[in-house]
């Protein structure tokens, strides 16, 4: 992930609207989704009742799980079709259409922010980080999860520098991230930042037919090899979290 350039928002909308129509958006198993929310609870340290924004909420799976965990959650996504899909699936959850770089929320209106696989969709995430800072209260926390460029599978399949890169199922905007670069962006926005890594998030679906046949092998390796402590920096997902200092 390089710092520079702007997100092509129309391509993001078109891509995810198409996924909403095909109902192929929610790629994680229910157990993997629950594990991500457990990571949010652990890293954010927020109490039940805290107001949390789920940015890049897609069809609202994580927004719903945040609500079930006791938070007052609202989800935002740039895709109107995914928001509509989510409202149908989760009628008791508030989901709205919007741009994470121009959030329709007041200053200091949230205790926490979840960036749902969102940061790696921005060639330059500095404006996104500034908006997260703006809407968080002082002492508020954010947690982001994104594919790790240091993971060999993520690099081979999702990085444009790889000879095996597949454009199927990914947008033109997204790149796997380097943890240090994302941490630096949020640190420069006035956050106290920490980095962790997560394995064991089983996929139920990937868009590429060729890769889909190998999915059980990937899920097995992810749940075994990458759980070893020595493999921590190479786990498939980076967890970036931070506290707004002032």
Residue ranges, per PLM feature:
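Acceptor-substrate binding/catalytic loop of class I
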Residues: 164-181
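A short glycine-rich, Lys/Arg-flanked "PGG" loop and its adjoining helix->strand segment in the class I
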Residues: 126-138
